């Protein structure tokens, strides 16, 4: 996802930061993880580095899954590695990321800590995500990186892999970067590396922060006996967490049209946004089509057809087309259904202002207390929605709401991607001064190290390490986070994934989505026409990439065929269902949590 921050969204960021600070003071330290196998003793007493390291360990880097001695040992490794780079004249580096709470914590706190402990100054710029992508594109085109390190969405993995401008970390850690790689890095502890791995099996990015897109609902309203009785009388099944889009639609209609008001204020059964704006594209590329069931079966992304509707060769290397006529699914019946439901629900069940809102403007609305459920909700809003005094928070600080897996459309099948997960990841250019890259790699490892990662997770609620997720500190926080900890502890989380490797040039293709979706919102185009146009434009871009060539695996479009003959019930593009609204299905929230613990996606 690409976040754009309006004034409203900036308030969300501030609230996230404030809530994170509150959490830090309540979570106890833990020492459950194994010590990093770093060479050398803990930092020797008396040195400036020792004083700085001890200060930060005692005052800031708590809780941690490491003991204080283990933290000191890990920091000693960073001090020694940095000393070798300083001897080569490296005293300062520049890195960049988007503006979310986690990265603000890195820029304002961890960069300062890194400088005090290692002596290398870090200029960690915070800019809008759209600007990160634009600057990244410019650097890729010129061949000169304007930063020593980048935190870039793993959505660009297919782009990075194919252009050959981004460093392959697997080979770097085994070769030129071996002496700069923390022995305690513990890659297996990272939960998102499958999302940053290319078709060649090599790691191209190191995860720095993650958040998922889930279903959000007012558990307190869903538990009201009068509403449960009223819903069952009308629909014939229990009011609960919707398992399919039919139930979501029924619940949306129920709250908007039947309940109408709660405590004298209007209540709506749905919330969304529809303004013609780049954020409208992310509303779809962040896996909306996969939730409907547009793609093929496959984790992390459908194979051979992914959630953008792009078909790739059997080895996942060569994109072959987005339109149904080329074997893709961007304008398939399932994709058209997904767009149709998005438009219909927003116009029928959301506040009337929703169609004119951007992502940043719509994000804070559920916290105001007049939304009963939202099918497309980012866990990055968790902390903002747990502030005391909000209409959606109890007096004891526990939320009145919960998060759950998003319901699935009628085309969805077991084994498909279930939803989206954002994975902001450290990215480095190949043709960049080696010592500058090494220093930036040190900083990247520092801000993701076990010494600091649990505190960072509590601050921004964007976990990257299994050891942090399983810590006592997160257990203690869980009751106030509305299901976030339970989700990330579930083996089922692997079905929430970022954009995959089928997408050959994310920036060029992503910009096509919002312009076409917007025309379906305004009614200038039917959903079918909008998706037909989008699919054709995607094929045109991939044809240009094919002609221009790419370092690895450029697109090679399939010849056009008869779309009707491409549709099948064996795989994507799926043929149109006779009934796109089966009976609604719901589940009790506690039963759902039990399924999560068992590793079931549903």
Regions of interest found by a model, annotated:
Residues 154-165, 170-174, 190-237, 249, ...:
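Periplasmic solute-binding protein
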Residues 43-87, 154-214, 263, 400-405, ...:
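Hinge/lid segment of periplasmic solute-binding proteins
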Residues 197, 347-352, 361, 369-371, ...:
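Extracytoplasmic/periplasmic substrate-recognition and gating elements
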Residues 88, 112-189, 224-226, 230-232, ...:
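Extracytoplasmic "Venus flytrap"/periplasmic binding protein-like
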Residues 19-22:
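Bacterial signal peptide processing site
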Residues 77-79, 399-408, 458-521, 547-580, ...:
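Long, aromatic- and glycine/proline-rich binding clefts that accommodate carbohydrate-like moieties
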Residues 77-84, 101-121, 216, 220, ...:
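Short, polar/charged alpha-helical segment
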Residues 247-256, 290-356, 406:
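Glycine-centered hinge/linker elements that transmit conformational signals in sensory
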């Amino acid at each position: 996802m690409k976040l754009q921050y309006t004034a409203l969204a900036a308030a969300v960021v501030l609230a996230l930061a404030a809530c994170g600070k509150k959490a830090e003071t309540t979570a106890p330290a833990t020492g459950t993880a194994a010590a990093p196998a770093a060479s050398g003793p803990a930092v020797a007493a008396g040195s400036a580095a020792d004083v700085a390291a001890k200060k930060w360990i005692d005052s800031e880097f708590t809780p941690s899954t490491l003991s204080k001695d283990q933290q000191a040992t890990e920091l000693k490794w960073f001090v020694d590695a940095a000393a070798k780079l300083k001897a080569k004249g490296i005293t300062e580096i520049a890195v960049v990321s988007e503006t979310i709470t986690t990265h603000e914590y890195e820029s304002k706190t961890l960069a300062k800590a890194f400088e005090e402990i290692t002596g290398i100054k870090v200029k960690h710029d915070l800019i809008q995500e759209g600007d990160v992508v634009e600057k990244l594109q410019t650097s890729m085109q010129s061949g000169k990186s304007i930063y020593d390190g980048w935190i870039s969405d793993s959505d660009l993995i297919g782009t990075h892999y194919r252009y050959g401008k981004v460093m392959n970390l697997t080979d770097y850690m085994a070769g030129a970067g071996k002496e700069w790689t923390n022995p305690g890095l513990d890659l297996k502890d990272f939960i998102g590396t499958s999302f940053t791995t290319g078709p060649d099996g090599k790691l191209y990015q190191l995860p720095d922060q993650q958040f998922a897109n889930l279903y959000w609902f007012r558990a307190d309203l869903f538990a009201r006996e009068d509403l449960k009785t009223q819903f069952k009388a009308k629909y014939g099944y229990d009011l609960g967490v919707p398992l399919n889009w039919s139930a979501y639609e029924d619940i949306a209609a129920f709250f908007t049209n039947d309940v109408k008001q709660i405590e004298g204020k209007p209540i709506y059964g749905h919330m969304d946004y529809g303004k013609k704006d780049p954020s409208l594209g992310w509303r779809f590329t962040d896996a909306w089509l996969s939730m409907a069931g547009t793609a093929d079966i496959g984790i992390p992304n459908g194979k051979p057809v992914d959630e953008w509707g792009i078909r790739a060769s059997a080895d996942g290397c060569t994109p072959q087309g987005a339109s149904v006529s080329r074997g893709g699914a961007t304008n398939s019946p399932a994709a058209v259904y997904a767009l149709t439901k998005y438009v219909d629900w927003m116009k029928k069940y959301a506040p009337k202002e929703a169609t004119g809102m951007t992502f940043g403007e719509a994000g804070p609305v559920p916290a105001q207390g007049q939304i009963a459920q939202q099918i497309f909700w980012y866990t990055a809003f968790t902390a903002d929605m747990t502030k005391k005094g909000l209409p959606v928070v109890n007096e004891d600080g526990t939320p009145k709401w919960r998060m759950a897996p998003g319901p699935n459309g009628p085309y969805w099948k077991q084994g498909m991607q279930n939803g989206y997960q954002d994975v902001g990841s450290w990215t480095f250019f190949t043709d960049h001064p080696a010592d500058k890259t090494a220093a930036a790699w040190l900083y990247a490892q520092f801000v993701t190290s076990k010494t600091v990662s649990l505190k960072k997770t509590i601050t921004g609620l964007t976990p990257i390490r299994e050891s942090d997720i399983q810590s006592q500190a997160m257990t203690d926080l869980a009751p106030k986070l509305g299901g976030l900890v339970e989700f990330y502890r579930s083996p089922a989380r692997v079905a929430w994934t970022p954009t995959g490797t089928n997408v050959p040039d994310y920036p060029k293709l992503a910009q096509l989505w919002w312009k076409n979706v917007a025309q379906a919102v305004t009614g200038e185009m039917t959903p079918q026409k909008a998706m037909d146009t989008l699919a054709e434009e995607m094929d045109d871009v991939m044809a240009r990439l094919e002609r221009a060539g790419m370092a690895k695996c450029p697109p090679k479009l399939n010849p056009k065929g008869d779309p009707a003959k491409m549709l099948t019930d064996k795989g994507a593009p799926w043929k149109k269902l006779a009934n796109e609204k089966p009976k609604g299905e719901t589940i009790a929230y506690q039963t759902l949590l039990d399924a999560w613990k068992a590793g079931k996606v549903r």
